[in-house]
Amino acid sequence: MSKTYAEINDRIKKGEVVVVTAEEIIDIVDEKGVKKAAQEVDVVTTGTFSPMCSSGAFLNFGHAKPRIKVQKAWLNGVNAYAGLAAVDLYVGATELPEDDPLNKVFPGEFKYGGGHIIEDLVSGKDIRLKAIAYGTDCYPGKELDTWIKLEDLNEAVLTNPRNAYQNYNCAVNLSDKTIYTYMGTIKPKLGNATYCSAAQLSPLMNDPEYKTIGIGTRIFLGGGVGYVIWQGTQHNPTVARTEGGVPKGGAGTLSVIGDLKQMVPDWLRGVSFRGYGATLAVGIGIP
């Protein structure tokens, strides 16, 4: 049974829409069959909430007096990329403070990084902004040391060049020593297995051939509203697939964007991976 977006939106307005998760629909189909389930259910929601290093935020903090064209900048000691316009910055989820000991004492703890900056912003915390510049006629300022909050910024935009990986890896360790990776700590001699997939809830596993999700799709992002803007980096739809079209390895990805000011720390969390680095866990939901 097919339903149009207009029909479903009309049921939403009337308060009659039936929404279930991709996990719940499995039991409904088992009990009632595909046809009956399609008749009764209007929307099936998918989602994922996991660390994604390919994350960051564009920030515009407005002009100071005197005006400054930022050359280098730091947020709570974490480097922010300033190679944009005068007071535009980009903070990447994996960026670290310049004084972080890193892996000099192995394994490093990586207690604070760009992902934590983003979480602190959406938590309403004050962030120390330090910036330097070489000075120009139109931007004479050479130094800035101030405190900012998310509500003070002109714009704050969360960007994920890659997220919602379709059928990602499982990691095991066959060696005799513990290894520290972006998949977490992996114990020797098959002592554990770590994976990163939302399984039956995974957005692109429920749309394996990308027939529903695409450019312009409106999504839940970090607790707010976001949009799919392009295929994600490392998008590879040509991997081997099952007869049903499900990829046998890592395949599709999504590039997404959203207004950071709408988001909440419940769905944006700074993460520290021992021996590897810092990142950001991002909550995504796609109907």
Residue ranges and their predicted role:
Residues 2-287:
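Anaerobic metallocofactor- and corrinoid-dependent redox/one-carbon enzyme cores
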